[in-house]
Swiss-Prot record:
It is found in: Secreted. Its main location: secreted. Keywords: Amidation, Amphibian defense peptide, Antibiotic, Antimicrobial, Secreted. One of its GO terms (biological process) is defense response to bacterium. Expressed by the skin glands. This is Dermaseptin-J4. One of its GO terms (cellular component) is extracellular region.
Amino acid sequence: ALWKDMLSGIGKLAGQAALGAVKTLV
């Protein structure tokens, strides 16, 4: 379960980073 939480956290951070990059580019 721990690795699932880690993957979930990484996914959220990656999603936020992607959104931030898109907003910056646009």
